[in-house]
Amino acid sequence: MAVYTNPACRTNTSAFPGPYRPYSNPSRFSFNLDKFRPRTSAIKVPSICCTIAREMEKERSEREPDVLQRPDSFGRFGKFGGKYVPETLMYALTELESAFRSLSGDQVFQKELDGILKDYVGRESPLYFAERLTLHYKRPNGEGPEIYLKREDLNHTGAHKINNAVAQALLAKRLGKKRIIAETGAGQHGVATATVCARFGLQCVIYMGAQDMERQALNVFRMRLLGAEVRAVHSGTATLKDATSEAIRDWVTNVESTHYILGSVAGPHPYPMMVREFHAVIGKETRKQALEKWGGKPDVLVACVGGGSNAMGLFHEFVDDKDVRMIGVEAAGFGLDSGKHAATLTKGEVGVLHGAMSYLLQDDDGQIIEPHSISAGLDYPGVGPEHSFLKDIGRAEYYCCTDEEALEAFKRLSRLEGIIPALETSHALAFLEKLCPTLPNGTKVVLNCSGRGDKDVHTAIKHLQV
């Protein structure tokens, strides 16, 4: 079988079964990032489960677009993103995108969504001045940054994930889909999806790695209590990557009746764009609240990055504000040199996984390397394509913190502010130890507290002395 591949990327065998083609209908969208189009060449590849398809060529427009206008008409963020999926999913993705764009301008839909976010989810979430954490980072001369927490942990279900789950459930209802599937790592997206399915009377199936089910037993019980069927995934590493693969296989089989609520800004177009837009409320509220609290904008934004949805929800509003630093923090696990980490943007290379081109953790043959993080929500070998794009153009910075550093930050916030953060959030909090000594006095730092840590207490007990 002749297929087309991009020599800048590698293939891997863990993404999709079946034949593939790239998204190839450029006429329906107005965006274009042709400037970043990857070079292509045709080569023959023997029997593989996921091919890197040839990028569609198109004429350059006379006027170069803003490079930060994204995605383009192919669902690409520069060379990242796209739609590398089985033929059976093309119609569903096109239908989903059409519905999303239509409902974006539907005032009835938006009013219903806003009402649910306010009365059911509990938005807006507070922008909280962490006074004692701020004092902790004061230098001997009394100077230092001011730290604010965007309290997504106070949302219904305890994390930012509910923003996207509610919106996609409403979208699924408009599409006439009665069955919902989702993947989950830490369990927060699974709980959020099970919650909205209970709210709207939809059948719910959650795929979760067997290893993650063991370390997130509380969330497994919560999902089942809410009426969801939780299916354990034992293949591969039995973590988030494998749960995502199983969810996609289910979707391929049941695409007519089923909507897949993907939980991050990853996957094939339009998911990275759509999930970003549903989480953009985080950044929009932050801008408004910052103006109310100190009459300006944040100077620095900090968020943890696994797939990257909470970070993108915070960052998106400020991407065009060049004076606002955006910092994503990945999981360094046992350390970058150990090989046991999930620092995709720090150590990864470009490839295709789960329908999109992005940075991945992979070996010389393009096979996915098993990631590691004490945090189930960061334990993923890929990352959202827009994060890859922001990294490559230098708009966002990405660093990483180890399991040990995250655990110390978990304890630190608990004792200084009386807030028990999720282990995912704890990675972002841990980076403050390195960041704060470098910041000028009075710098306004907003850190996205993406989730609460109740779910992680069982894990923390094994590692922390309190």
From Swiss-Prot:
Keywords: Amino-acid biosynthesis, Aromatic amino acid biosynthesis, Chloroplast, Lyase, Plastid, Pyridoxal phosphate, Transit peptide, Tryptophan biosynthesis. CDD domains: Trp-synth_B. This is Tryptophan synthase beta chain 2, chloroplastic. The keyword Ribonucleoprotein does not apply. One of its GO terms (cellular component) is chloroplast stroma. One of its GO terms (molecular function) is tryptophan synthase activity. The modification N6-(pyridoxal phosphate)lysine is found at K161. Signal peptide: none annotated. It is found in: Plastid, Chloroplast. It comes from Camptotheca acuminata (Happy tree). Pathway: Amino-acid biosynthesis; L-tryptophan biosynthesis; L-tryptophan from chorismate: step 5/5. Its main location: plastid. InterPro entries: Trp_synth_b_CS, Trp_synth_beta, Trp_synth_beta/beta-like, TrpB-like_PALP, TrpB-like_PALP_sf. Belongs to the TrpB family. It comes from the Eukaryota. Its cofactor is pyridoxal 5'-phosphate. Its EC number is 4.2.1.20. The keyword Amino-acid biosynthesis applies. Tetramer of two alpha and two beta chains. The gene is TSB. It catalyses: (1S,2R)-1-C-(indol-3-yl)glycerol 3-phosphate + L-serine = D-glyceraldehyde 3-phosphate + L-tryptophan + H2O. The beta subunit is responsible for the synthesis of L-tryptophan from indole and L-serine.
